[in-house]
Amino acid sequence: MPDRSHLQSGKDAERQALEHLQHQGLRLLAQNWLCKRGELDLVMLDGDTVVFVEVRYRKNTQWGGALDSIDGRKRQKLIFAAQYFLQRESRWANSPCRFDVVAIDSHQDQLNWLQNAFDS
C-alpha cells in the first residue's frame, strides 16, 4: 500500500478486506458500526452466520504483524460490541456468529483471512 496517513491506510485496508470477502461470497450488513463499547469494522453474513470482522493493517512489523496486534483486551472489546450489535439488530440475535480477522502486512503485500479467529 502507498505510504499514507495511518487513518487512510486503515480505510484502504478495510476496503481491500471488504472486496475480498464479498468476492468469497459474504454479504455486507454493516461497516464501521459504532457503539459505546467499541467499533466493528465489518459485519457480514456468510450463509446464515453473522461474521464480525476485525481488519488489521501493519505497515511495519517491528512490534509484530497485523495478527499479533489483537490482544485479549481488543478481543474483549470486539465481543462486547458484537453482543451490543446483536441486541440492537434483533433479527440476527438467533443466528450463529463467528469472529474473523483480516490481516494485511504491507511488507508482504498479502491479505490473510483467518476465520473463527477467536471465540466469545
Swiss-Prot record:
One annotated GO molecular function: nucleic acid binding
Instruction: Please give one Pfam family short name.
Output: UPF0102
**What InterPro entries does this protein map onto?**
Restrct_endonuc-II-like, tRNA_endonuc-like_dom_sf, UPF0102_YraN-like
Q: Which CDD domains match?
A: PoNe_Nuclease (cd20736)
Q: What start-end ranges are recorded for coiled-coil regions in this protein?
A: none
Transmembrane stretches in the record are none
- Report which superkingdom the organism of origin falls in: Bacteria
Which NCBIfam families does the UniProt entry name for this protein? PRK12497.1-3, YraN family protein
**UniProt family annotation:** Belongs to the UPF0102 family.
- The name of this protein is UPF0102 protein Pfl01_4685
Q: What is the lineage of its organism?
A: Bacteria, Pseudomonadati, Pseudomonadota, Gammaproteobacteria, Pseudomonadales
